[in-house]
């Protein structure tokens, strides 16, 4: 792993935030710009990235003119649209990020640090983004990502086969839940990278990951209407809690 770093300081350069917002959502139409507690959901991450004050560029990667206009209205840059290759249902996030980095390179701009932010992550805050960058610099990590603990121990999980349940790992049957190792999953919010290590990995997961542990009340995957409503409930709850 390359461990050369520049001092972050108050005016760290060569840092880009890339918000990935494709227009073709099928399960929740126009998901990335749908109203969420009073404004388009993508607005939350744009505002958080700008407020963090650590990015030279906050941009949105999209194939949608509507998403582009709304994103610009909240302060993000949209200097180009996605290619056909990165606009389909099978495009990998890593390919989108590579495309953005290469496009900026062709415009004479290269970045040392990058944060990929998902547009439907309203729990992302400026403080979390700064925390990630500080961890990236301090620990000389290749990547920093938010994670949250599984609410129920996966090692006590079951699989269904031929209409019957079987424990996936029966060796843990007699173990108390509190005695099992805590396992975590991706919070699905953002990834911060040291760009040379991102290129080296060739995918969104690199070696040398430093975690930021998030409370489960600040994490919600949004794939359907039930998820959306749950996210709004959590968001309102967290807002009330901060008052």
Language-model region placement:
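Short active-site oxyanion
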Residues: 54-59, 142, 217-218
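N-terminal amphipathic/basic-hydrophobic helices that include classical n-h-c signal peptides
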Residues: 1-11
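Conserved core of the sugar-phosphate nucleotidyltransferase
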Residues: 93-95, 113, 122-208, 213
């Amino acid at each position: 792993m390359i461990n050369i770093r520049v001092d972050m300081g108050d005016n760290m350069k060569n840092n880009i935030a890339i918000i990935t917002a494709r227009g073709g959502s099928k399960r929740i139409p126009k998901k990335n710009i749908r109203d969420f507690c009073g404004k388009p959901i993508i607005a939350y991450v744009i505002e958080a990235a700008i407020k963090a004050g650590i990015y030279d560029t906050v941009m949105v990667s999209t194939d949608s003119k509507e998403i582009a206009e709304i994103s610009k209205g909240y302060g993000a840059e949209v200097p180009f649209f996605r290619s056909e290759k990165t606009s389909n249902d099978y495009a990998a996030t890593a390919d989108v990020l590579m495309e953005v980095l290469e496009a900026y390179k062709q415009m004479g701009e290269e970045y040392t640090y990058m944060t990929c932010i998902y547009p439907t992550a309203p729990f992302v805050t400026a403080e979390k983004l700064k925390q990630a960058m500080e961890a990236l610099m301090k620990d000389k990590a290749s990547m920093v990502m938010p994670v949250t603990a599984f609410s129920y121990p996966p090692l006590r999980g079951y699989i269904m086969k031929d209409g019957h349940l079987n424990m996936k790992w029966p060796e843990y049957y007699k173990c108390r839940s509190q005695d099992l190792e805590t396992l975590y999953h991706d919070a699905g919010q953002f990834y911060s990278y040291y760009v040379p290590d991102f290129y080296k990995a060739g995918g969104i997961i690199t070696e040398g990951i430093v975690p930021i542990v998030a409370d489960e009340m600040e994490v919600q995957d949004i794939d359907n209407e039930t998820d959306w409503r749950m996210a709004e409930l959590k968001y309102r709850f967290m807002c009330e809690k901060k008052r």
